[in-house]
A protein has these predicted regions:
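Extracellular/periplasmic carbohydrate-active domains that bind, remodel
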Residues: 1-214
Length: 214
């Protein structure tokens, strides 16, 4: 597992011209630190995805501590921009840290995601899975959010995010759980009949288009 526990990364390279029509199966973009590795200062720009279930999956977990530092990993300072995704499933974009290992400083800008939809509202909380294998199904195949689920994370900017459901969906477009400093601007939602586009639990300092959410 050297790549998931390493604290030394070279993100200076720029990867272009990734082949189109590349079907990933689970998550189109997966950022995972579960063995103590540090992932920071990465930009994802100008990406179009099809044939995926979850557009973006960001997971910070405690499967193992780093063998050198004895610490859990870090995920911070990531930018996602100019992204479109046509998903074939119902599991939304996930940003999930842990109660003691929080994901910080993430920007989602100019993103359009399309999901199958057709789900009922979900009232139960997602289970923690602190040592599970990192993949979009690790918290279950159901999710309380139709387009974006954020848990154990701080300082997230969501700007010009458009969520579409092909079938009428009862879930809110965004669900926030134990999150702070979440700033949402220009959110668009199509196909959701939830009473609120955004639901939250145990959160603080949430703003939507500059207005504080209580």
């Amino acid at each position: 597992r050297p790549t998931t526990e390493s604290n030394i990364w070279d993100w200076s390279k720029e990867y272009r011209h990734i082949a189109p029509k590349t079907h990933t199966g689970l998550s189109g973009i997966a950022i995972e630190s579960v063995d103590g590795g540090i992932i920071e200062q990465v930009t994802f720009n100008n990406i179009s995805m099809e044939g995926i279930i979850t557009p973006i999956f960001i997971c910070l977990n405690h499967r193992r501590m780093n063998q050198h530092s004895g610490q859990s990993g870090i995920i911070r300072n990531l930018l996602f921009s100019n992204i479109t995704a046509k998903a074939e499933g119902i599991i939304p974009t996930l940003i999930a840290g842990t109660p003691t290992g929080r994901i910080t400083d993430i920007t989602l800008r100019d993103i359009t995601v399309e999901h199958a939809g057709g789900e009922k509202a979900m009232t139960k909380s997602l289970p923690e899975n602190l040592k599970g294998y990192p993949e979009n199904r690790m918290y279950g195949k159901e999710n309380p959010a139709g387009g974006l689920y954020i848990r154990h994370a701080d300082n997230i900017l969501i700007e010009n995010f458009h969520i579409r459901q092909r079938n009428t969906d009862e879930r809110p477009s965004i669900f926030l759980d134990d999150a702070t400093d979440i700033h949402i601007e220009k959110l668009q939602s199509t196909g959701s009949i939830a009473k609120k586009m955004i639901e939250h639990s145990k959160c603080s300092n949430i703003t939507i288009d500059g207005r504080v959410v209580k």
